[in-house]
Regions:
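N-terminal ordered "arm"
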Residues: 1-58
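A broadly used, surface-exposed interaction patch
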Residues: 52-87
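Short amphipathic beta-strand/extended segments with alternating polar/hydrophobic composition
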Residues: 45-46, 53-61, 199-208
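Long, compositionally biased intrinsically disordered terminal regions
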Residues: 75-211
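Generic N-terminal initiation segments characterized by hydrophobic and/or small/turn-forming residues
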Residues: 36-39, 71-75, 204
Length: 211
């Protein structure tokens, strides 16, 4: 069975908040846990309903070093088990169906005020409520609309509304409007780093990849 060890209570609470948000957005969400090469940090990944990935890094380690578990079971383990070692639940690796971005090759593009990003997200939510589809969700055409274009390091990067929805829905932005989010990119990927986590998405549409 998988085993999760976190550095301290703060790291447990941080990961718990991340998983709770993911489960709130999608009760069937799975979380992929991956150790960093340094052995001291691990990355938690989740595929959001907005067709973006969300990630949070915490101090700790998991065995095996790359495992996918049910978000609801992981949340239970983080909430109930107060000892050093946590049972994150049974492995569900076959349920992870998203490609992960590369570790290296990222270039800095721009920094944006949190207040600006929050307002754009709020405006998008208001528009989405008026344009929900038959299943009660915004149409893909709305989510794919570019709300920001940023430039840097020789790259022009378009930020779609769905990325801002994911940042807001996962609670990554916080309430300090004077803070900034960082936009970085590769030729194929876009990443927006905020105070409490990051949202990642392919810059160009392509067929889904299985990993």
């Amino acid at each position: 069975m998988p085993e999760l060890v976190l550095a301290d209570r703060d790291e447990r609470d941080d990961l718990g908040a991340f998983v709770a948000r993911a489960v709130r957005l999608d009760a069937q969400a799975v979380v992929r846990l991956r150790n960093r090469e340094d052995g001291r940090l691990l990355d938690a990944w989740v595929a959001t309903p907005f067709d973006t990935l969300a990630t949070r890094t915490v101090a700790g380690r998991v065995e095996p070093s790359d495992v996918t578990v049910a978000g609801s079971e992981l949340l239970t383990g983080l909430t109930v088990m107060r000892g050093e070692r946590i049972d994150p639940g049974a492995p569900k690796d076959l349920m992870w169906r998203s490609a992960l971005p590369p570790v290296e090759g990222w270039l800095p593009v721009d920094r944006l005020p949190v207040g600006v990003v929050s307002r754009l997200a709020d405006e998008g939510v208001a528009v989405a409520r008026e344009n929900t589809g038959p299943h009660g969700t915004p149409p893909a055409s709305l989510l794919d609309q570019t709300v920001l274009t940023v430039s840097g390091s020789g790259l022009d990067v378009k930020v779609p509304l769905r990325c801002l929805f994911a940042l807001s829905g996962m609670g990554f932005l916080g309430s300090a409007e004077e803070e900034e989010v960082r936009v970085i990119a590769t030729d194929a990927w876009l990443r927006i780093d905020a105070r409490f986590g990051a949202v990642v998405r392919r810059r160009h549409s392509m067929l889904p990849l299985l990993v």
